């Protein structure tokens, strides 16, 4: 390390200051995989990835499975780290110990804090986060931001005032401005549930409530939609779509589909078949049948297997195991969804560099001068006279 770098690092007041390649922020980050491959891809852009530290927001209308998806991530974190603790800030009071157990979360490892206002959430959260040391395993779960009033809104109601609260968005921004640095410096994932609403425009948009604060602070924002899964006229469940509104790892506006059925819960294989079809590693040799294809890396040829499968028979490790172990399939997923470095064209860069460094030259006017307006008028008169003569 150069003397200048050493002196600058030594002069810093932060204990975490280090050369970027040796920084804990980039080299000591937890990656927590869930039991749902499509969720892992939505979180990181690759099958082997998953949830990392930072603020993750799940937003959507009522009954869009937001809390369930959030608890699925909490369960995965606590399963990976048996000594982990969950800080649960509760404003909806709909999650019971029995419900937590059904989602794979041990209630004895959950610290439950009922909150009634944004100000209370801000004070409690910053005090608890400040007490955590980096390396201690903690996951934060907020259910929900959309249901939290500001202190002023509550006071206005008690004083029988009916004016609109113009401070809520400002308070929300203050909350995340204070707590977000803790998530990165202490390697803590925070999963927050939020609501959405439709804008009042000719072509309405689905946007997240709470102002700009949550969106600015979040590493990932999923806006969740859903559609019915039916067998004839019988409703069997719902297909939820994770719309990537913001992400630091995945291409924005990507969509990831996850099926939840009444008789089996979350389908861990949901979304994979359509994705593999789109990427070209699964084909339909005939209607209703599917076959895998593998890339021969020596010839670049896609080799199709002889066996064909029905769609319902593909939901198994027998079908997906060979594809998950196939590196070109993993690489194709990363190319399709993961944010990568900006590609550069060396030839174009060299041309632009040459233009920038070229010498200034004095402009030389062309030898043949353009005609004046008077000359053009004379030409037009002559042309008109010739036309009259020909007639």
Swiss-Prot record:
Important in genetic recombination, DNA repair, and replication. Possesses pairing and strand-transfer activity. Interacts with dda and gene 32 proteins. Keywords: ATP-binding, DNA damage, DNA recombination, DNA repair, DNA replication, Nucleotide-binding. It comes from Enterobacteria phage T4 (Bacteriophage T4). It holds the Pfam family T4_UVSX_C. InterPro entries: DNA_recomb/repair_RecA, P-loop_NTPase, RecA-like_N, RecA_ATP-bd, RecA_monomer-monomer_interface, T4_UVSX-like_C. This is Recombination and repair protein. Gene3D superfamilies: P-loop containing nucleotide triphosphate hydrolases. Residues 376-391 have a biased composition (Acidic residues). GO terms for biological process: DNA recombination; DNA repair; DNA replication. ATP binds at residues 60-67. Residues 364-374 have a biased composition (Basic and acidic residues). Belongs to the RecA family.
């Amino acid at each position: 390390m150069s003397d200048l770098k050493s002196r600058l690092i030594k002069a810093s007041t932060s204990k975490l200051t280090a050369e970027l390649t040796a920084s804990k922020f980039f080299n000591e980050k937890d990656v927590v995989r869930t039991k749902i491959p499509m969720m892992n891809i939505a979180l990181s852009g690759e099958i082997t990835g998953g949830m990392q530290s930072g603020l993750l927001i799940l937003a959507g209308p009522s009954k869009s499975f937001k809390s369930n998806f959030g608890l699925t991530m909490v369960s995965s974190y606590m399963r990976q780290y048996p000594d982990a603790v969950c800080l649960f800030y509760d404003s909806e009071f709909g999650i019971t110990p029995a419900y937590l157990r059904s989602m794979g979360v041990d209630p004895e490892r959950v610290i439950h804090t009922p909150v009634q206002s944004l100000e209370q959430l801000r004070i409690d959260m910053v005090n608890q986060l400040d007490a955590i040391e980096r390396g201690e395993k903690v996951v934060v779960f907020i259910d929900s931001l959309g249901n939290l009033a500001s202190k002023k809104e509550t006071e206005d109601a008690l004083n029988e005032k009916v004016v609109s609260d113009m401070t809520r968005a400002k308070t929300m921004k203050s909350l995340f401005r204070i707590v977000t640095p803790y998530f990165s410096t202490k390697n803590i994932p925070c999963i927050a549930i939020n609501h959405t609403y439709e804008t009042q425009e000719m072509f309405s948009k689905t946007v997240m409530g709470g102002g700009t604060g949550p969106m600015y602070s979040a590493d990932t924002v999923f806006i969740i939609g859903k559609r019915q899964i039916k067998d004839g006229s019988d409703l069997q469940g719902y297909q939820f779509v994770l719309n990537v509104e913001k992400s630091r790892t995945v291409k924005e506006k990507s969509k990831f589909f996850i099926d939840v059925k009444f008789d089996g819960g979350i389908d861990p294989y949901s979304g994979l078949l359509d994705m593999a079809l789109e990427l070209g590693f699964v084909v339909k040799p005939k209607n209703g049948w599917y076959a895998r294809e593998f890339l021969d890396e020596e010839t670049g040829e896609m080799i199709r297997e002889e066996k064909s499968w029905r769609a319902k028979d593909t939901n198994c490790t027998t079908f997906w195991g060979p594809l998950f172990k196939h590196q070109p399939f993993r690489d194709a997923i990363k190319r399709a969804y993961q944010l990568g470095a900006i590609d550069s064209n060396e030839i174009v860069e060299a041309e632009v560099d040459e233009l920038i460094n070229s010498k200034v030259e004095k402009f030389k006017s062309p030898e043949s001068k353009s005609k004046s307006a008077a000359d053009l008028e004379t030409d037009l008169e002559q042309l008109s006279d010739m036309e009259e003569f020909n007639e």
